[in-house]
Amino acid sequence: MSLVYMNIMTAFTVSLTGLLMYRSHLMSSLLCLEGMMLALFVMATLTILNSHFTLASMMPIILLVFAACEAALGLSLLVMVSNTYGTDYVQNLNLLQC
């Protein structure tokens, strides 16, 4: 495994660890998710370029589309929660409350 792949896997692991450890605020969770998606995008792009697999060349672009949709939904949820509750604490979000 080359140094580039190890750095990308380290970035993904650090983002995943940040998501698991610092999940008290919704904004920090969204930033960690974006870091994970960026690492997945770079890993998919490098894998496709190195293997010369031209049939899967659209896969990183599709991944970016889903990442943009995820970011838009996450930010709209952040705005809705901060307007409703005044904070962005994840502990305040309970689906069992009316």
Curated annotation (Swiss-Prot):
Protein's UniProt keywords contain Cytoplasm: no
Pfam families from the UniProt entry: Oxidored_q2
Reactions performed catalytically: a ubiquinone + NADH + 5 H(+)(in) = a ubiquinol + NAD(+) + 4 H(+)(out)
Annotated GO MF terms: NADH dehydrogenase (ubiquinone) activity
Localization (cell): Mitochondrion inner membrane
Its job: Core subunit of the mitochondrial membrane respiratory chain NADH dehydrogenase (Complex I) which catalyzes electron transfer from NADH through the respiratory chain, using ubiquinone as an electron acceptor. Part of the enzyme membrane arm which is embedded in the lipid bilayer and involved in proton translocation.
Full protein name: NADH-ubiquinone oxidoreductase chain 4L
Lineage start: Eukaryota, Metazoa, Chordata, Craniata, Vertebrata
